[in-house]
């Protein structure tokens, strides 16, 4: 199977640059797999498609301000007297650090993307605001770095103060204070994601209450979203694709709710990947690099709410595997013609 089969054309003006003022006002394209058809609805209509015995599964991972801006720290010698060099540090060269995930037990070593990457060598230090400092300690096979934050103190508190919201690159603007709220689901709890589980952005407490009133139970899972989930794939043969790993967890209580459901309605591809990993491996917590493509069975997911995805990505392949490639690509063409809003701050699709 070739990756070129999972491509489509999207005009730039359909890529949502701002969140709607009302989370639940998004449009929702409902795709009926068995009938091979779709209908245009509003997200607020979601409870109409739920029934007693359903379990709505939400990813409660919380986005943290993962973009840090600092400067390279160099060493400069200043001669003071004939044989008395005094060394002091000077700042040179702007550096951006995009944190991906903590990789050490104490939480001070992080996998990160560093720009400009080619100029930053192992052993170099980066100085951020408030005196926060990090050292590059390793280079990864995909060009990422491992950085170690020096000193002590609560790193997440420091990130909250000096970090920026990690908006995706297709949102062509700087982050704003409003993004701290809107690029976060109302049910986010567990810090660790560098990208929002975007299907959850549409929910309000009122919509969740209406889903429960329709007879659906609500469970949460946690998958900390990494950058690799959204990146374009570089392997042309779909079956050869290898994804980056992400950490997931399902509590025993939530596993019980999911197991008792007659139909599991997964909110977002991250919830799908968590559910399908646990069903495949029989493990409620661990690392997953599961890649769902046409031909791979879905063991637990009965319906799915998802946003619209970029061409040639693992997520477009995933929804095509769930709904059928031809039906999914036809639905995407309709969404373009009907001028739906695309990607993270855009509209959503319900696949039943």
Curated annotation (Swiss-Prot):
Q: What is its EC number?
A: 2.4.99.17
User: Which Pfam family, an example, fits this chain?
Assistant: Queuosine_synth
Family statement drawn from the similarity comment of this UniProt entry: Belongs to the QueA family.
What SUPFAM superfamilies does its record include?
Answer: QueA-like
Q: Which GO terms describe its molecular function?
A: S-adenosylmethionine:tRNA ribosyltransferase-isomerase activity
Q: Which PANTHER family match?
A: S-ADENOSYLMETHIONINE:TRNA RIBOSYLTRANSFERASE-ISOMERASE
TM stretches of this protein? none
Q: Identify the coding gene.
A: queA
Record's subcellular location: Cytoplasm
Coiled coil regions in record = none
Q: Name one GO cellular component term.
A: cytoplasm
Any one biological process term the GO annotation gives: queuosine biosynthetic process
Outline the subunit composition: Monomer.
Swiss-Prot/TrEMBL keywords: Cytoplasm, Queuosine biosynthesis, S-adenosyl-L-methionine, Transferase
| Annotated catalysed reactions | 7-aminomethyl-7-carbaguanosine(34) in tRNA + S-adenosyl-L-methionine = epoxyqueuosine(34) in tRNA + adenine + L-methionine + 2 H(+)
User: What is the stated purpose of this protein?
Assistant: Transfers and isomerizes the ribose moiety from AdoMet to the 7-aminomethyl group of 7-deazaguanine (preQ1-tRNA) to give epoxyqueuosine (oQ-tRNA).
| Involved pathway(s) | tRNA modification; tRNA-queuosine biosynthesis
Name this protein carries in UniProt: S-adenosylmethionine:tRNA ribosyltransferase-isomerase
